[in-house]
Swiss-Prot record:
Native organism: Coxiella burnetii (strain Dugway 5J108-111)
Recorded metabolic or biological pathway in which this protein acts: Protein modification; lipoprotein biosynthesis (signal peptide cleavage)
InterPro entries the UniProt entry points to: Peptidase_A8
Gene encoding the protein: lspA
Keyword Protein transport: no
Protein name per its UniProtKB record: Lipoprotein signal peptidase
Length: 163
């Protein structure tokens, strides 16, 4: 029996798995070598500061009584399924789209794992300029941001086939 080689972007899911592994490893290391709320200076503009986020980006809804954990876990899971289906219908030749989708999937599932295991997401990357600090984030958040950026660029640069 001869099988036809798939031209779909499924092989890009390896990148999602790599993002999940790097995210979970970095969070494991942060939890074992950092103390909650105590910054470790890496560069003049970068600290590693362990924080636990029960909300979403910028700790949105982080002070609620717990329902938000299930809510954000469900959103992460549903969005990941949707993006996996989108990736399954994407041509392997659409590299920027495949790369963006894979990064977002890996990031969303990395944070999903944290929410299921701990009821919070571990954040530790702390960029700052003097006393102004950006929201503390993690590898999964970075992958999501880069993935969204790539999708936006792809959509802006790719001519639409619609009239």
């Amino acid at each position: 029996m001869v099988t036809k080689k798939s031209k779909k972007a499924w092989p890009w899911l390896w990148l999602s798995v790599l993002v999940i592994l790097l995210d979970q490893l970095s969070k494991y290391l942060a939890n074992h070598f950092l103390s909650l709320g105590h910054p470790v200076k890496i560069l003049p503009f970068l600290n590693f500061t362990l924080n636990y986020n029960t909300g979403a980006a910028f700790s949105f809804l982080g002070t609620e009584n717990g329902w938000q954990i299930i809510f954000f876990a469900a959103i992460s899971f549903v969005v990941s399924i949707f993006l996996i289906l989108w990736l399954s219908r994407t041509s392997r030749s659409e590299i920027m789209m495949s790369l963006g989708l894979s990064l977002i999937i890996g990031g969303a599932l990395g944070n999903f794992i944290d929410r299921l295991r701990w009821s919070y997401v571990t954040d530790f990357i702390d960029f700052h300029i003097k006393d102004w600090h950006f929201a503390t984030f993690n590898v999964a958040d970075s992958a999501i941001c880069v993935g969204v950026f790539l999708l936006i660029v792809y959509m802006l640069l790719t001519p639409s086939s619609k009239p």
